[in-house]
UniProtKB/Swiss-Prot annotation:
It is an enzyme of class 2 (transferase). It is found in: Mitochondrion. SMART domains: SpoU_sub_bind. Residues 1-42 form a transit peptide. This is rRNA methyltransferase 3A, mitochondrial. Residues 328-345 have a biased composition (Acidic residues). Keywords: Methyltransferase, Mitochondrion, rRNA processing, S-adenosyl-L-methionine, Transferase, Transit peptide. One of its GO terms (molecular function) is RNA binding. It holds the Pfam family MRM3-like_sub_bind. S-adenosyl-L-methionine-dependent 2'-O-ribose methyltransferase that catalyzes the formation of 2'-O-methylguanosine at position 1485 (Gm1485) in the mitochondrial large subunit ribosomal RNA (mtLSU rRNA), a conserved modification in the peptidyl transferase domain of the mtLSU rRNA. Also required for formation of 2'-O-methyluridine at position 1484 (Um1484) mediated by MRM2. It catalyses: a uridine in rRNA + S-adenosyl-L-methionine = a 2'-O-methyluridine in rRNA + S-adenosyl-L-homocysteine + H(+).
Length: 435
């Protein structure tokens, strides 16, 4: 009996411990931290056990406030919807109003313009094609960019065909009375920036008929200050150099510029940018044969050439010889210089002279050669026939040559100085005779 009671008590103890352990284990599970998202709920209705619903009785003032709030919200939404629909249908009101006011101003000058639609490729097509020399020669069109260059072209009498602009203010900066025959197209500034060669374009690109120098009207003040000095470019193939040469010729008051075949096109965009409007300040005749060049010069003109490369010039600079005779071109003193001397034997004989000595005493023409090929035989022959000189600029030892544009600037302004001094001398003589 004692043994039975012992076993029963032991079993109860074990059962209690097991339940205790389970309780503690379950308690751990229940008391574990659980991060649950809190939800905010709002009761829809209150139901009582008898099935009735709770009804909320609002005052008349609360009802009026609620209905008034809903009415104001609905009206605001309606206004926003109508405003958006109006914008979608008629475009931005401010832009249209501004354009309409500007259009009224343009109507006073009798002008109309069109706005390029989305996907319009006229600017892209014209800009890419107008930069081709073959297209310019075939179609007779040139591309001008920027307000100043376009204004110079219009003032000289050039004929505009199409003008692309980004803002109406840019268009009004041009002389509107000279745009009657042009087609005006308003495009986005991003399109002009895409097809322009400039980093920061002004928003104006124009297509002109290729100007003819014989039909242009040049500024009277520039022509009155001109001197009988003619510039001939011989195989100048660098666009930047040619543009700078044209600019120097206009600044020095040259009479005209003649470009031989082999020169870069005078209407190349880079030439136009470098010349800074010189095309419309003095006549420029491009793509001429040497026979045509002679026809553009007066009969009593003396043609000089700019050259620093001849052996006689180097000897004169170094002080070895003072006067170079024709015998120096026919005989050689050493076998090392046979090739160089033989080359000069075959060339026309033109005496060298320092540029600051007297050489422009009447109508004078100056030939500037390209840096790659130098002077042509035709240029030297023309200088020989007119008793011209081979002009050179002395330089410090170790310097091979000057840039062609720099040499042209030095010689052109020296020629202008000599011609103006001659004119003043003749004027003083005439006054003395009158007295």
């Amino acid at each position: 009996m004692a043994a039975l009671m012992y076993n029963v008590s032991r079993g109860l103890v074990m059962l209690g411990e097991r339940s205790l352990f389970q309780r503690e284990r379950y308690q751990i599970l229940v008391n574990s931290r659980r991060f649950l998202r809190g939800l905010r709920r709002r009761p829809v209705a209150v139901l009582y056990p008898d099935g009735e619903r709770e009804t909320l009785i609002k005052s008349k003032r609360a009802t009026d406030i609620t209905s008034q709030g809903f009415t104001q919200k609905g009206k605001a939404r309606k206004d926003v919807t109508e405003r958006a629909a109006y914008k979608n249908c008629s475009g931005f009101v401010s832009e249209r109003a501004e354009e309409s006011s500007q259009i009224n101003k343009l109507k006073l000058a009798g002008l109309r313009f069109e706005k390029a639609p989305a996907g319009d490729n006229r600017l892209a097509r014209v800009s890419s094609v107008a930069r081709s020399r073959a297209f310019r020669d075939k179609e007779g069109k040139v591309l001008l960019e920027g307000r100043r260059l376009i204004c110079d072209a219009l003032s000289a009498g050039a004929s505009p065909q199409m003008i692309f602009f980004s803002l109406l203010e840019r268009l009004q900066e041009l002389p509107l009375d000279k745009l009657q025959q042009a087609k005006l197209i308003k495009v986005k500034y991003e399109d002009i920036k895409l097809w322009s060669d400039l980093v920061t374009p002004q928003g104006l690109i124009a297509i002109f008929s290729k100007p003819d120098a014989s039909r242009l009207t040049f500024p009277k003040d520039a022509r009155l200050q001109s001197v009988p000095l003619f510039l001939i470019c011989d195989n100048v193939r660098d666009a930047g150099n040619l543009g700078t040469i044209l600019r120097c010729a206009a600044a020095a008051g040259g009479d005209r510029v003649l470009l031989s075949k082999g020169c870069v096109d005078a209407w190349e965009p880079k030439v136009l940018r470098s010349a800074m409007g010189a095309h419309f300040r003095l006549p420029v005749f491009p793509n001429l044969d040497w026979d045509d060049i002679s026809k553009h010069l007066p009969k009593n003109v003396i043609v000089h050439v700019a050259d620093n490369y001849s052996t006689s010039t180097k000897q004169l600079v170094s002080g070895q010889t003072e006067n170079v005779s024709s015998d120096d071109y026919s005989e050689s003193d050493s076998d090392d210089d046979d090739d160089e001397e033989e080359d000069e034997d075959s060339l026309p004989h033109v005496k060298p002279q320092v540029y600051h000595e007297c050489w422009a005493q009447r109508s004078a023409a100056l030939v500037i050669g390209g840096e790659t090929h130098g002077l042509s035989v035709e240029a030297l022959r023309l200088a020989e026939e007119t008793d011209g000189k081979r002009l050179f600029v002395p330089m410090a030892p170790g310097v091979e040559s000057l840039n062609s544009a720099m040499a042209a600037g030095i010689l052109l302004f020296e020629g202008r100085r000599q011609l103006l001094m001659l004119s003043d001398k003749l004027r003083r003589r005439a006054r003395t005779k009158m007295l």
